[in-house]
Amino acid sequence: MPEFHGRLVVLGATGFVGSHVVDRASQAGWQVVPLSSRDVDLGSPSSSLALAAILEDGDTLVHAAAVVPSRNAADVCRNLLISQALVDAVAGVAVAQLVVVSSDAVYGSDSGVVTEKSSCSPDSLHGAMSLAREMVCADVSTPVLTLVRPAAIYGNGDTHNSYGPNRFARQVLESGEITVFGAGEATRDHVTVADVADVIVRAIQTREAGILNVASGQSVSFADLAALVRDVGPAGARVVVAGSESSPTFRTYDISGLNRRFPDLVPTGPAVGIEQMVVAMHGSANA
């Protein structure tokens, strides 16, 4: 793997993905400049000037600053303002690479196999925001623009509590009871936050341009995910059914593109990743 030179500036450095990128890059001995909203509030009118004063020619920039998930128009607008502030800030800076941490929500939620060549057809505000955010960032003049589109991310430290591994793990540790909608038939690919950070660091080392879908390559039903969490949870944990699962969809990822770029990458499977997360969450709760 080629050696990285220069500074890595991470926006959203205290967020779920951003903090893991900072940790992973720091472990590799890189010069990391972590920036959170406390350092530069990209939603404020003068933020582009503040960020421009920090940036230097040759910097590599990871854009992980966002309000996620975007649940309303205000969230969408704020995210686009944040990205526009970034674009304005780098107008006079020779950025070596811009990595935009986006989402697989840009593809919508229909059943099927997803690849980097799949068409973008978002069917949620979060998906529409993610795609618009990518388009705003495309205005940055850089020799390497990398769009990272992870599948649903899970891991210790997640704050979103979305339906799936993160919520199931919290439920099993708090009450010993995991709630699944209907039969839990819908299938999704879930990827660990550590794997997402690893791919981002790899993409910087090799200056990968274009779209990178990040997934485990293993799609699992929500019922099976709940069972995996139950089995590594406290004794007596159980799965209960609530309501119904309307129009379940079945999504899989072809990660051959990811494998071609990083032949030695071994994604973390759900059985291993979920056990690691539950153990880490239990340890954090008892710390």
Q: Language model features by range: what are they?
A:
Residues 45-81:
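NAD(P)H-binding glycine-rich loop region in Rossmannoid oxidoreductase-like domains
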Residues 121-146:
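Active-site Tyr-X1-5-Lys
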